[in-house]
């Protein structure tokens, strides 16, 4: 498990999240969306599968088929959920 900062432009907020770095990116996005919606007491419009997770450091869009470990994202990593 690692702790990362996830910035979500829709809410203009950054969230600290504990993530299993071996979990697939698609599942990570789904879990993040669920947690953020609960924290904000709202529902995200659109389809969760259309969200993208990006690594701020490398300026990469992360492939849903891979995992955070594949991108060498570690504790303190900064991600962007759009």
Locations of regions flagged by a protein language model:
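Ubiquitin system architectures
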Residues: 1-82
């Amino acid at each position: 498990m690692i702790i990362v900062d996830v910035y979500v432009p829709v809410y203009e907020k950054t969230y600290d999240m504990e993530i299993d770095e071996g979990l697939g990116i698609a599942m990570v996005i789904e879990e993040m969306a669920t947690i953020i919606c609960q924290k904000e007491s709202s529902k995200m419009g659109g389809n969760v599968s259309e969200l993208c997770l990006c690594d701020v450091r490398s300026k990469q869009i992360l492939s849903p088929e891979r995992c955070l470990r594949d991108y060498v994202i570690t504790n303190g990593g900064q991600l962007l959920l759009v």
